[in-house]
């Protein structure tokens, strides 16, 4: 999987704008959480849909960016968490064991 690193709040406006052309997926990962590591591993082993951009956010290193994601897209912060953005809005967010590529892919159509 070719993640795009999400490490600045300035990227959020570009993600929002790009979501009008194709879905944008943000995966918020905690390097201190075994559940987050398991969710990351499951995503990286899955076949990656080509009709979306996938962003990786290390929320320990970039907590302020994680907070900005929650505020910008009006989602409650969780870790791990996956967020799908379409047409400038969050259309799906899930956390912990419910994070699967099949569920993400279902939101991309």
Per-range role (PLM):
Residues 73-86:
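Structural micro-motif
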Residues 1-21:
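N-terminal leader/targeting and pre-domain segments
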Residues 86-109:
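Non-catalytic, surface beta->alpha helical segment in thiol-disulfide oxidoreductase systems
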Residues 16-46:
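Local sequence-structure signature of Cys/Sec-based thiol-disulfide redox active-site neighborhoods
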Residues 12, 37-44, 71, 92-95:
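A structural signal for the main folded, soluble domain(s) of proteins
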Residues 48-50:
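Short helix-capping segments at alpha-helix termini
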Residues 36-39, 65, 69, 100:
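Amphipathic alpha-helical interface surfaces
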Residues 52-66:
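Thiol-based oxidoreductase modules, predominantly thioredoxin-like and allied folds used
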């Amino acid at each position: 999987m070719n993640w795009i690193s999400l490490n600045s709040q300035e990227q959020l406006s570009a993600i929002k704008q790009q979501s009008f052309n194709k879905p944008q997926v943000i995966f918020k990962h905690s390097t201190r959480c075994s559940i987050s590591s398991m969710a990351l591993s499951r995503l990286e082993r899955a076949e990656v849909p080509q009709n979306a951009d996938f962003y990786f956010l290390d929320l320990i290193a970039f907590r302020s960016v994680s907070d900005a994601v929650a505020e910008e897209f009006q989602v409650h912060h969780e870790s791990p968490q996956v967020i799908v953005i379409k047409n400038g809005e969050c259309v799906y967010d899930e956390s912990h064991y419910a994070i699967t590529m099949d569920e993400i892919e279902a939101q991309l159509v």
